[in-house]
Every structure is written in C-alpha cells, then in structure tokens.
Amino acid sequence: MAMKMKGIYKSFKSIMFVGKERDLEIGHPTEVKHVAHIGWGSSGSDPGWMSDFKAGAEFLSPRTSSFSHTRHSDSFFTTSDSTEFDQDQLNISDRIRDVPPIPVGLSKIHTKSKNRRKKPSSTSSPRSRPSPKSSRSMGLSKSSHKSMVSRLNSNA
C-alpha cells in the first residue's frame, strides 16, 4: 500500500511542476515594460530626475585620466563625507603597509610537523623529553633551527 501511495504522490508532483514550467518558457508575452536609451550620454533627452545622477556619474566616470580631489558643486557627494572617505582610504592603505610579510617557509614547517610520526618517549631518560620552549617542539627542522640560531647570533 505504501508503494502505491508513493507512486501516486510522484505523479501528482510531476503534474504540479508541469503546470509551473509553462510560465517560464521563452516566447510567451510578459508584462514587463522595457525602457531603453536612458543613460549617461550627452543628449538633452534625459529626464529631469537624472540630472543629479549625471553629475555623480561624471565624477565617478572611469574615463577620467587621473583621480583628482576636486569636487563638482552640483555633485550629490558632500564635502565632509568625501573627506572622511579619503581619510578612511588612507588609513586602510597605512594598515596594509604595517602588516608584516608572511615568511615563505612557514607553510612548509607546519606541513612537515603534521606528517612526522612521534616516537614513544621513555621515562628513564631525561634527554628524550624536549623542553616546552625548544625549537624542536615548535616543529622546526634541524636546518631551519641552525639558520635561526645563526641569525640570532649575528643580530646580537
């Protein structure tokens, strides 16, 4: 009985979706009205409400050769808002400059430490346990440990 109900449900489900697909088919007339040729061109046929946006578009246009800090008097940007925006941009660039570079070999160090098997440590020998601050416990190889020690010694 459950199989018959499942089959009936599937047939109703397919009938429901067939009816909806007809609305999405290409070629049927729609109620959408398209408006063409309203843009940022130099023609005088732009509507009156576009004048504010046109001034802003001239300011933001990628066609300008250089970005200057001069503001149009009829622009919809206010002077205080644009000044704050410029200051925010400077602060972001300063922040990016202050970030230290990521060491090149850092990702290699971490992948090696994940793949390395740990040897069982014996409790009888105190040498087998690395100290918590040792370079070996940080996942550094012998060669990177030697180069780090030599750099520290040369800086001191």
From Swiss-Prot:
Domain CRIB: 26-39
Region (Disordered): 87-156
Compositionally biased region (Low complexity): 121-142
Domain of life: Eukaryota
Compositionally biased intervals (Basic residues): 109-120
CDD domains found in the cross-reference section: CRIB
Biological function: Functions as a downstream effector of Rho-related GTP binding proteins of the 'Rho of Plants' (ROPs) family. Participates in the propagation of ROP GTPase signals in specific cellular responses.
Protein name as annotated: CRIB domain-containing protein RIC11
Species classification: Eukaryota, Viridiplantae, Streptophyta, Embryophyta, Tracheophyta
